[in-house]
C-alpha cells in the first residue's frame, strides 16, 4: 500500500514538474506582417496573408458564395463560399523586402490612404505589423506612398498565385482542356511579375507534369514554371 502511494506521489510530482517546466511557457511573439483585402464581387472577395520573418506564413480567405441565379436566390439563400487555408513559404528576398519596408514605414503607423477624391474602389486593404519591437497598421483603398503600393502589389501577386493553384487543381480534375489556356495565363502573369512565389503551388504543377494523359504542351508549361521556381529558390539560398 505504501509503495502504491509512493508511486502516486511520484507521478503527481512529475506531472507538476512538467506543468511548470519552461517548455510550457508561451513562446515569445515573432515579427509578422499581414495583408488583408476585401472587395465584393471577386471570386475570393476577402483574404488575409500572414508572413513571419522566417518566411513561413498562411493564406486564408473565403470563396464567393455560390448562387444559382436570381430566381434560385429568391427561393433559398446562396451557399456559403468554401474557406481557404493554405500554408505558404516565401523566398528570402521577398521576405526581406516585406520586413524592410514595414520597418521603414514605422510599422505602418503612418497615414497611408490617399486623400484624393473620386478614386475608384479597388478594395479595402490593411497592412499590419506585429512584433515585440513595435506594432501598427494602416488601412487604405488607394495609396500614393510608393512603398505601400509596392507591398500591395507583392501581396496581391502572391494571392494570385495561390488562387491560380486552386484553379489548376480544379481544371486538372474537371476540365483538362481548360488547362492549356490557363497555363498560358499563369506564365504571362509570372513574366509580368503579377504572380509571385510560384513554388507555393509546386504540388499542383508537379501533378500536371506527371499526368501523361494531358497534352504535352500543358505538361511542358508546368515543367517550365517548376524549373523557374526551383531556380529562384536555389539562387535565394
Predicted region positions:
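Short amphipathic beta-strand/extended segments with alternating polar/hydrophobic composition
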Residues: 48-52, 69-72, 76, 81-90, ...
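N-terminal secretory signal peptides
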Residues: 24-71, 75, 100
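Bacterial N-terminal signal peptides
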Residues: 4-14
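Charged, amphipathic alpha-helical segments
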Residues: 91-116
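A mature extracytoplasmic/lumenal domain signature
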Residues: 53-55, 63, 94, 102, ...
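Short, well-ordered, aromatic-rich surface patches in folded extracellular/luminal domains
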Residues: 16-41, 111-237
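Acidic/histidine-rich, surface-exposed loop or edge segments in extracytoplasmic proteins
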Residues: 56-86, 184-186, 202-206
Amino acid at each position: 500500500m505504501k509503495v502504491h502511494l509512493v508511486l502516486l506521489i511520484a507521478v503527481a510530482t512529475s506531472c507538476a514538474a512538467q506543468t511548470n517546466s519552461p517548455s510550457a511557457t508561451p513562446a515569445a511573439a515573432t515579427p509578422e506582417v499581414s495583408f488583408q483585402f476585401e472587395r465584393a464581387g471577386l471570386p475570393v472577395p476577402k483574404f488575409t496573408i500572414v508572413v513571419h520573418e522566417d518566411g513561413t506564413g498562411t493564406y486564408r480567405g473565403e470563396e464567393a458564395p455560390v448562387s444559382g441565379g436570381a430566381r434560385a436566390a429568391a427561393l433559398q439563400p446562396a451557399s456559403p463560399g468554401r474557406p481557404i487555408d493554405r500554408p505558404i513559404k516565401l523566398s528570402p528576398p521577398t521576405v526581406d523586402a516585406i520586413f524592410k519596408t514595414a520597418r521603414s514605414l514605422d510599422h505602418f503607423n503612418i497615414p497611408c490612404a490617399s486623400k484624393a477624391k473620386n478614386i475608384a474602389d479597388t478594395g479595402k486593404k490593411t497592412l499590419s505589423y506585429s512584433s515585440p519591437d513595435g506594432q501598427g497598421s494602416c488601412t487604405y483603398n488607394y495609396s500614393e506612398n510608393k512603398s505601400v503600393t509596392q507591398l500591395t502589389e507583392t501581396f496581391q501577386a502572391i494571392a494570385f498565385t495561390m488562387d491560380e493553384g486552386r484553379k489548376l487543381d480544379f481544371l486538372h480534375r474537371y476540365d483538362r482542356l481548360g488547362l492549356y489556356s490557363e497555363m498560358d495565363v499563369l506564365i504571362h502573369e509570372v513574366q509580368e511579375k503579377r504572380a509571385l512565389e510560384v513554388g507555393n503551388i509546386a504540388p499542383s504543377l508537379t501533378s500536371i507534369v506527371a499526368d501523361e494523359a494531358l497534352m504535352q504542351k500543358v505538361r511542358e508549361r508546368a515543367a517550365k514554371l517548376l524549373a523557374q521556381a526551383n531556380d529562384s529558390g536555389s539562387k535565394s539560398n
